[in-house]
Amino acid sequence: MVHVFQLGSKVALSVISPSTMKFTNILLSIRSSKVRRAIFRKYSKSMYEHGEREPPCLDIIMRWNSTLEMYQEALKLRYVLSCTIVNSIIAAYFIDSMFNIDYWNHIQAMEQWLLLPARICTYLSGSKYPTLSLASLAFNGMLSHCNNKI
């Protein structure tokens, strides 16, 4: 039941925010290249007192709340990601992916939107099996949440 709910929230997110896939692809391209990952680490080491950081993990359709976690981590590392993308060595690769303040505001809004589905998924996947009436309330609440955003 929770898996279906999670899949539904991912589909709703793709309708509300088609840029989610673009953002995932940007993170994928940073994570998949040794050079881009090294540049990311260099910036993270110089910008954060905790030292070197890895790029945010990608959202995975099978892992609950992974899109929320991806957005939360990316927002923490937004300056590092922005610097990595405009780095002169790799900037040509990201020519159409420049982040501005509006894009980060959009990411933050999507992160806020995902908080309710994450709470519902976490609750429904708890140790007690949810009743049908509870699941119905959760689904109705999520439909209302989606309709308010659209």
Where are the predicted features?
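A eukaryotic "domain-edge + linker/cap" signature
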Residues: 1-150
